[in-house]
Amino acid sequence: MAASKDGCGVGEVAAGNGRRLHLGIPEAVFVEDVDSFMKQPGNETADIVLKKLDEQYQKYKFMELNLAQKKRRLKGQIPEIKQTLEILKYKQKKKESTSSLETRFLLADNLYCKASVPPTDKVCLWLGANVMLEYDIDEAQALLEKNLLTATKNLDSLEEDLDFLRDQFTTTEVNMARVYNWDVKRRNKDDSTKNKA
């Protein structure tokens, strides 16, 4: 099987070479010389090597599925955070006002309720896991801006990891094709020597 180098975590840089490691995704090493590669211990037959490469390919597919799910979740969170920040900025402007704010809020799909919100300098934010906390508007805005920055960085990191993973797919597929072609040539060569004998 192609050699692999394991990374440690998000945003870490490999010692010495200055490259970012990708979520512990093992790097597929391109097989330059198939003959010498097939002579390595554990690479007795092309079938064994192809099976190992296919297992590695399936692992990459599984990793891609997980990263794609994380990406979808982040792409859904970022607009929600931005919308909440816009609402907080509006509340910040209206904080000194004495009149109450008339609004409609979503109860369920296509079902809204009308509400009158008195002037306040406090807001409640859903933190997840059925937890809601009350914050000052400034604290809530700082928290949401930090969360938006983190979510954006994570999304960028996921994009890089998915690109890296696509490169590993390609390398593994090319390695599989090279080993398969090597085996076909070897068998044709064996058949031609048997026919001559």
From Swiss-Prot:
Modification sites for N6-acetyllysine: 59
**Which SUPFAM superfamilies does this UniProt record tie to the protein?**
Prefoldin
Q: Please name the InterPro entries in this protein's record.
A: PFD3, Prefoldin, Prefoldin_subunit_alpha
What are the recorded Gene Ontology BP terms?
A: microtubule-based process; protein folding; tubulin complex assembly
Q: What is one cellular component GO term in this UniProt entry?
A: cytoplasm
Q: Does the keyword Cytoplasm apply?
A: yes
List the subcellular locations.
Cytoplasm; Nucleus
Q: Which residues carry this modification: N-acetylalanine?
A: 2
Q: Name one Pfam family in it.
A: Prefoldin
Alphabetic keyword roster: Acetylation, Chaperone, Cytoplasm, Nucleus
Q: Which GO terms describe its molecular function?
A: tubulin binding
* Protein family: Belongs to the prefoldin subunit alpha family.
How would you summarize the oligomeric state and partners of this protein? Heterohexamer of two PFD-alpha type and four PFD-beta type subunits. Binds to the C-terminal part of VHL.
**Function of the molecule:** Binds specifically to cytosolic chaperonin (c-CPN) and transfers target proteins to it. Binds to nascent polypeptide chain and promotes folding in an environment in which there are many competing pathways for nonnative proteins.
What name has this protein been given in UniProt?
A: Prefoldin subunit 3
